[in-house]
Amino acid sequence: MNYPNGKPYRKNSAIDGGKKTAAFSNIEYGGRGMSLEKDIEHSNTFYLKSDIAVIHKKPTPVQIVNVNYPKRSKAVINEAYFRTPSTTDYNGVYQGYYIDFEAKETKNKTSFPLNNIHDHQVEHMKNAYQQKGIVFLMIRFKTLDEVYLLPYSKFEVFWKRYKDNIKKSITVDEIRKNGYHIPYQYQPRLDYLKAVDKLILDESEDRV
C-alpha cells in the first residue's frame, strides 16, 4: 500500500518503542517516545471503557488501483494509495455534544506551521462549528512535550491571517494564550476532555 506520493506505507515501529517495560514507563512519566495519535488512542479507549465518551479516529480513505484474483473466492490487492482525508481525524459524542477535531504534531519549538492543514478540513470544521459542534485542533509540540487544545473559534482567526499571506504559522505563545493546556498523566494519558469541559463552558457563554 502506498501514499499519494508513491512511497510505500511502513508501520512506524518507534511508536511502540523497544521493550514493554520502557513503554510502560512512558505511561507513568509523560508522553515522550509516543506519538500524539497513540496517546489519543489510549485516552479514547479509556473513555469508551469508562462510559465517559465515544470518540473514534476516522479511517483514512484508500483508493484501490490494482486487484488480482488468483482464486474466484479470493482477491489480492496489489496496489493501493492513501487518499487525502476529506474531513478531520476524530469525531464522536460526549455528554450530548458532538466532538470533532484534528490532531497535529510539530518538531518546531516556537510555532505551529499551517501548511499541513487543508482547506477542505477547515471548511468541514467551520460547518461542524456552525451546527454547534465542539470543534478544535489538538496540537503537540514534540520538542517541548506540550499539548494544547486550540478551539476552532480561535483557530479561524489565525487561518484567515494565513490565507491573507500575513503569517504562515501560529506561535507557541499565541497557542498558549488562546488554547487549553492538556497535561500528561497516568490514566488516561491525555485527559483532553477536561479541556473540552472548559471549552464547552466558555463557548456556551460566547454563543448566547
Curated annotation (Swiss-Prot):
First-tier enzyme category under EC: hydrolase
Organism domain of life: Bacteria
Catalytic activity: Endonucleolytic cleavage at a junction such as a reciprocal single-stranded crossover between two homologous DNA duplexes (Holliday junction)
Free-text remark on how the cofactor is bound: Binds 1 Mg(2+) ion per subunit.
Site feature (Transition state stabilizer) residues: K104
Residues bound to Mg(2+): T87, D89, E102, Q121
SUPFAM superfamilies per record: Restriction endonuclease-like (SSF52980)
EC number(s) on file: 3.1.21.10
Assigned keywords, A-Z: Cytoplasm, DNA damage, DNA recombination, DNA repair, Endonuclease, Hydrolase, Magnesium, Metal-binding, Nuclease
Main localization category: cytoplasm
Xref: CDD domains: RecU-like
Family according to the record: Belongs to the RecU family.
Protein name: Holliday junction resolvase RecU
